[in-house]
């Protein structure tokens, strides 16, 4: 099932989210240290990624402006964004950098350990060269 909104192509974006989009791997074992985790569930993550999905779910025409790797995790993120109705025409792909990953544990109510795997990752490569002329501020 595709949640894409039937927006008119000429309609301007309500929101363009720029920044981190990554893959979050949450440990399936709650209340267990990460070193004891046996399995993980994969989700779209990153502040900008989460906001683009949330606003799309609320009915806004949202776009994601970031970079992902051409690796399988980058393909996963692009597919998830599209599934959620987020416009990915501004989402760039780079073959030279891996998509960022985060491994997270869940120990409610106040402990949520996480490990970032973001060394020189794709979304950190975003720069002015990725902005096309129609997207640039006037």
Q: Language-model segments: which ranges?
A:
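Glycine-rich phosphate/adenosyl-contacting loop at the front of the ribokinase-like
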Residues: 2-86, 110, 114, 121
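Beta-strand->loop->alpha-helix junctions that form or flank phosphate-binding loops
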Residues: 68-69, 89-97
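Short beta-strand scaffold segments in enzyme catalytic cores
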Residues: 101-105
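Divalent-metal (Mg2+/Mn2+/Ca2+)-assisted nucleotide/phosphate chemistry catalytic cores
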Residues: 117-120, 132
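Single conserved hydrophobic/aromatic residue that forms the stacking wall/gate
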Residues: 129-138
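Short strand-connecting beta-turns/loops that link adjacent beta-strands
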Residues: 96, 108-110
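Glycine-rich, highly charged phosphate/nucleotide-binding loops
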Residues: 123-128
